[in-house]
Design a protein with these regions (language model features):
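Proline-rich intrinsically disordered, low-complexity coils
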Residues: 28, 57, 147, 227-228, ...
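Core of folded catalytic or high-affinity ligand/protein-binding domains
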Residues: 35-213
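Leu/Val/Ala/Ile-rich N-terminal alpha-helices, chiefly Sec-type signal peptides and the beginnings
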Residues: 2-46
Length: 251
């Protein structure tokens, strides 16, 4: 499979995006398709958000330091230092419960992007966006091992980044829900994710090392990240519907 350069990509590939999203909706665990959609539709997004980052004092300092977050987020000794109740401790628990890892996302992204390790500001910003995805799961309360949780965070991310690929995935998931029993609850939860992303502070300018020391609930308040109430309601409705189904017995 040919790799794609995020630096050279300037046009959107709608055909490729439709193929990838069809595969993704059939198998929400196929993370490779997410990166294909981003490569197809997010042309110029990293450059635009990098310019926004360096336009702020704190963002300029982060860009100047150019820390590779994957090296921090895969360092067990570094993660072990954070006290219970902090963002860092919550992220550590997230990794333990899900079995996910930052270097797992890194490996998948390198299957698609030829320049993910390139020493270029836009490529660095793209890597940073990749590496903070699971941190945003922790901050927002949208579960990563749940298809609806991913869709809600994707909608949140679209509001934060304006990356068309994120919006395309969220919209596709919402349209698919029209054929599902709990479809209305799913669509409301996705809309809530987008609304929360718009209302929250711009998270890209957060210093992750400082954020990880902060108590999780205090960080949510400071960043104006509201509780995912409609998402929780949709989860409960799905669980209730599942438990009310008659059990099938073997013939």
């Amino acid at each position: 499979m040919a790799a794609i350069s995020v630096l050279a990509k300037t046009k959107r590939d709608w055909r490729g995006a439709f193929r990838a999203v069809k595969t993704l909706l059939a198998d929400p665990d196929d993370t490779v398709q997410v990166f294909r959609i981003m490569a197809a539709l997010n042309a110029g997004t990293s450059a635009k958000n990098y310019r926004r980052l360096i336009s702020t004092p704190e963002g300029g300092r982060i860009a100047y330091a150019r820390v590779e977050l994957v090296s921090k987020l895969t360092d067990g000794a570094w993660l072990s230092q954070f006290a219970p109740g902090t963002v860092g401790a919550a992220y550590r628990t997230f990794l333990e419960k899900t079995g996910y890892s930052a270097d797992g996302l890194e490996a998948v992204s390198k299957e698609i992007h030829s320049d993910r390790g390139e020493e270029h500001p836009y490529a660095w910003f793209g890597r940073r966006e990749r590496d903070i995805h699971d941190i945003w799961h922790v901050l927002t309360g949208y579960r990563a091992n749940d298809p609806l949780g991913e869709l809600c965070l994707v909608a949140f991310t679209y509001a934060q980044t304006k990356g068309l690929g994120w919006g395309f995935i969220a919209l596709s998931g919402a349209l698919k829900s029209f054929g599902e029993p709990q479809g209305r609850a799913v669509r409301r939860a996705i809309r809530e994710g987008y609304a929360h992303g718009r209302a929250a502070h711009w998270l890209h300018k957060e210093d992750i090392e400082k954020l990880f020391v902060e108590p999780l609930e205090a960080a949510r308040v400071r960043l104006n990240i509201a509780p995912p109430l409609l998402y929780r309601q949709a989860q409960q409705a799905a669980q209730s519907a599942l438990s009310s189904e008659p059990a099938t017995s073997a013939a």
